[in-house]
């Protein structure tokens, strides 16, 4: 048997169970390789770690370069796309201002102010005096409390609404009808 162990090559060991020379790479993954294979296994582990480190550093470097290139490319494309839009905005902006000035000059002669469309908008407002002057309807539900827009404002809105409704003659007649019905 010793003669057979001596006949195995440098990267092989003699397996006494099989009575044959077996490559050391098969036993390097185990915790305890044979004594004749320890030098081979230590060298192969070191080489594989060096290879793994080289691959990791290469992938890290490539991903860093690619991400930097994509960032620069996006920045340049945004800059190029925004320049024509600025030129168009300057051209259309001066045209709109000219139209607005012409419309304002025309409207100064009349009673109404007509603003150019797209520049501003107006909202019609109804004041309390306008609502009181208008003919009140008994069946309308505008005397109910309005929804509060902010937290904690419910009491304020309800109080103002009740005060407003008490001042309307139609609301007073509606509440008198409700009182007379409930008194029966």
Curated annotation (Swiss-Prot):
Disulfide bonds join 8-21, 24-37, 28-41. The chain crosses the membrane at residues 55-77. One of its GO terms (biological process) is adaptive immune response. One of its GO terms (molecular function) is signaling receptor activity. Keywords: Adaptive immunity, Cell membrane, Chromosomal rearrangement, Disulfide bond, Immunity, Membrane, Proto-oncogene, Receptor, Signal-anchor, Transmembrane, Transmembrane helix. GO terms for cellular component: endomembrane system; membrane; plasma membrane. Residues 1-54 are extracellular. Residues 78-184 are cytoplasmic. Expressed in mature B-cells, but not in T-cells or monocytes. It is a single-pass type III membrane protein. The record marks 3-4 as: Breakpoint for translocation to form IL2/TNFRSF17 oncogene. InterPro entries: BCMA_Tall-1-bd, TNFR_13C/17, TNFR_17. It is found in: Cell membrane; Endomembrane system. Receptor for TNFSF13B/BLyS/BAFF and TNFSF13/APRIL. Promotes B-cell survival and plays a role in the regulation of humoral immunity. Activates NF-kappa-B and JNK. Associates with TRAF1, TRAF2, TRAF3, TRAF5 and TRAF6. It is linked to A chromosomal aberration involving TNFRSF17 is found in a form of T-cell acute lymphoblastic leukemia (T-ALL). Translocation t(4;16)(q26;p13) with IL2. This is Tumor necrosis factor receptor superfamily member 17. It comes from Homo sapiens.
């Amino acid at each position: 048997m010793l003669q057979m162990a001596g006949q195995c090559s440098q990267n092989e060991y003699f397996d006494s169970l099989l009575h044959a020379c077996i490559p050391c790479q098969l036993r390097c993954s185990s915790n305890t390789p044979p004594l004749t294979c320890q030098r081979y296994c230590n060298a192969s582990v070191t080489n594989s770690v060096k290879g793994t480190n080289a691959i990791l550093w290469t992938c890290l470097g490539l991903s860093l370069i690619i991400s930097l290139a994509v960032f620069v490319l996006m920045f340049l494309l945004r800059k190029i796309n925004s320049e024509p839009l600025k030129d168009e905005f300057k051209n259309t902006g001066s045209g709109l201002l000219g139209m607005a000035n012409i419309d304002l000059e025309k409207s100064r002669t009349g009673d109404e102010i007509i603003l150019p469309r797209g520049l501003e908008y107006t909202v019609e407002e109804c004041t309390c005096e306008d609502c009181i002057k208008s003919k009140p309807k008994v069946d309308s539900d505008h005397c109910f409390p309005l929804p509060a827009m902010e937290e904690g404002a419910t009491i304020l809105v309800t109080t103002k609404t009740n005060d407003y409704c008490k001042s309307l003659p139609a609301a007073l007649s509606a509440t008198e009808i409700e009182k007379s019905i409930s008194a029966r």
